[in-house]
Amino acid sequence: MADEGPRKGSVSALMGRTNGLTKPAALAGGPAKPGGTGGSRKLVIKNFRDRPRLPDNYTQDTWRKLHEAVKAIQSSTSIRYNLEELYQAVENLCSHKVSPTLYKQLRQVCEDHVQAQILPFREDSLDSVLFLKKINTCWQDHCRQMIMIRSIFLFLDRTYVLQNSMLPSIWDMGLELFRNHIISDRMVQSKTIDGILLLIGRERSGEAVDRSLLRSLLSMLSDLQVYKDSFELKFLEETNCLYAAEGQRLMQDREVPEYLNHVSKRLEEEADRVITYLDHSTQKPLIACVEKQLLGEHLTAILQKGLEHLLDENRVPDLTQMYQLFSRVKGGQHALLQHWSEYIKTFGTTIVINPEKDKDMVQDLLDFKDKVDHVVEVCFQRNERFINLMKESFETFINKRPNKPAELIAKHVDSKLRAGNKEATDEELERILDKIMILFRFIHGKDVFEAFYKKDLAKRLLVGKSASVDAEKSMLSKLKHECGAAFTSKLEGMFKDMELSKDIMVHFKQHMQNQSAPGPIDLTVNILTMGYWPTYTPMEVHLPPEMVRLQEVFKTFYLGKHSGRKLQWQTTLGHAVLKADFKEGKKEFQVSLFQTLVLLMFNEGDGFSFEEIKMATGIEDSELRRTLQSLACGKARVLIKSPKGKEVEDGDKFIFNADFKHKLFRIKINQIQMKETVEEQVSTTERVFQDRQYQIDAAIVRIMKMRKTLGHNLLVSELYNQLKFPVKPGDLKKRIESLIDRDYMERDKDSPNQYHYVA
């Protein structure tokens, strides 16, 4: 410390000079003010004759002091000198072009120190975790030391080093030395990487590990620029092997929901590792590796093993998780989409194809549609591809059984619109009809629906069984919107007929009041336009004279106002309200016309045989048997059948039940003849097929008339485009042959597959 004073003095003297110029305090920066005493003066500045020199041994002495400070930092001992003094010493040396030597000397000191650190790490006896802690301590010490060293040599770093692009900064030099002499050592690097992978492996197995240690070491590898080549490649390789084996094992051992939960958990864990200690650049390949091995390699197996069960059980959370996970991997959504479609087609086919399930088919379809809609809405995030393929799948399976679904959908609408349906409010009924219309869109045979819908609508209108005129018209509006005005024109005509009939009956009743005293029968007639309504087979029955007379009176009245028209009575559609006297008192019966004719016979006698009733009424055999069944074998047994039994035989006798009892005053006896029979179904379907033949013939003639000459394949293709119902190639061929036989068209003599229109 004895010579510290003189050193300070020389440094101070050196720093006090500025190129030999000392600026007097009296000098101003600008010219002298005008009006001042004395003349103008010149200031002459001369350069030093000799360049200022550092004191002898200054460089060596200063470096010795700096070297001592660096060694003290590296050995974690106290520094004898003030840091500001050391910084000033570096600046002094740099100002006198000693920078290259100073940089080399500093590098050598740092390199010697780093090289000396490698020896303890070459001991084989070190435990992996202990080794990692030791290397981490070494790294932390090195970083702390280089920060302090750089702060002392900052002037060197910001001048000489900055001006020489080939030289690394002092901090980068420290990283380079640590990388070259410690972490690039084969044994050290191997033990470091293996130790890190061991800790990560333990953590993946559920053990608690020192995450801060991992974070520090991986940050070290990243700073030393060996992270990607030395660690990441090996880490991803081990990750790949781990999850490949895990995926194979767990797919065998676990159910799909449990497996998907495990995949989600693994993805969350790996994402957390990236956030906590891995480099951000590892995130994409790491997550992709987990997704590929746990999901991508098992897409089909997962779907085959679990999708059907999840959908059957309506496991919404599990399906949501499946969709979210499958959306992460290439081809995942597509695979899910295809299996989803196959499930819909398979499950839907079981609903429509089995005749034993016809009773519940439409409700099952509606429930199934609600279910898949909910899955798309909640689980599949309203994905358009899933919505569109769901619609295609419904259309595919619902048409695997031609015609029947269309017929049953029409009947389902009838059950909802019929009076007595108490299960829904107006708003609920509207929603039900909207859902039914969705099913209606899927069916190809819309003409079959129309035929059965028209037949059921006729019954509702004629027997007064419609629950709501508003609901009826709402359904009509939906059909019109879906299929166009041509589809609903006849249905709308039926409503118009009913409204006109009401007006006609008002005038007829006024006419009857003016003509004579009212009779025992109050007649109401519905005038139906034959082209609008279903075709009904006329049945000639024996009406009571009073009914016949009233019919003639109405006929005369109507034709008097509408000359040129023809009336045809449809007895099968008639119904009446009869009054009857029993021992217990009076009752009223709401019955069909056929039931009316049978019951009126018992005004003339107490008992009749089946043959006698048949002769007296003229009702056809099968219709009469159903009528007598409703009167003698149903809940309201107005007649007593002898012998007892559910079936009506030829020799049966029927007696008036004078002891008939019922809690209601007006009793509706089930109108069995109004219920659809197998014959009616066949008849309705046959009429649809007949109408289709007419439409095919008309389309063929229309096309040939316009094109004159056309090949068979082109004609068939054109027909498929024009016809609005499903048709088989064989059916088209039959219609073409029929038109050729009827001379509407002819084959080309040289080319049988070519047709010519015959004018």
UniProtKB/Swiss-Prot annotation:
Pfam families: Cullin (PF00888), Cullin_Nedd8 (PF10557). Residues 20-31 have a biased composition (Low complexity). Neddylated; required for activity of cullin-RING-based E3 ubiquitin-protein ligase complexes. Deneddylated via its interaction with the COP9 signalosome (CSN) complex. (Microbial infection) Deneddylated by murine cytomegalovirus M48 leading to a S-phase-like environment that is required for efficient replication of the viral genome. Keywords: Biological rhythms, DNA damage, DNA repair, Host-virus interaction, Isopeptide bond, Phosphoprotein, Ubl conjugation, Ubl conjugation pathway. The modification Phosphoserine is found at S10. There is a cross-link at K8 (Glycyl lysine isopeptide (Lys-Gly) (interchain with G-Cter in SUMO2)). Expressed in oocytes (at protein level). In the ovary, also expressed in cumulus cells. Expressed in testis, spleen and kidney. GO terms for molecular function: ubiquitin ligase complex scaffold activity; ubiquitin protein ligase activity; ubiquitin protein ligase binding. PROSITE patterns: CULLIN_1, CULLIN_2. Signal peptide: none annotated. GO terms for cellular component: Cul4-RING E3 ubiquitin ligase complex; Cul4A-RING E3 ubiquitin ligase complex; cytoplasm; nucleus. One of its GO terms (biological process) is negative regulation of granulocyte differentiation. SMART domains: CULLIN (SM00182), Cullin_Nedd8 (SM00884). Residues 691-750 form the Cullin neddylation domain. Belongs to the cullin family. Can self-associate. Component of multiple DCX (DDB1-CUL4-X-box) E3 ubiquitin-protein ligase complexes that seem to consist of DDB1, CUL4A or CUL4B, RBX1 and a variable substrate recognition component which seems to belong to a protein family described as DCAF (Ddb1- and Cul4-associated factor) or CDW (CUL4-DDB1-associated WD40-repeat) proteins. (Microbial infection) Interacts with murine cytomegalovirus M48. This is Cullin-4A. It comes from Mus musculus (Mouse).
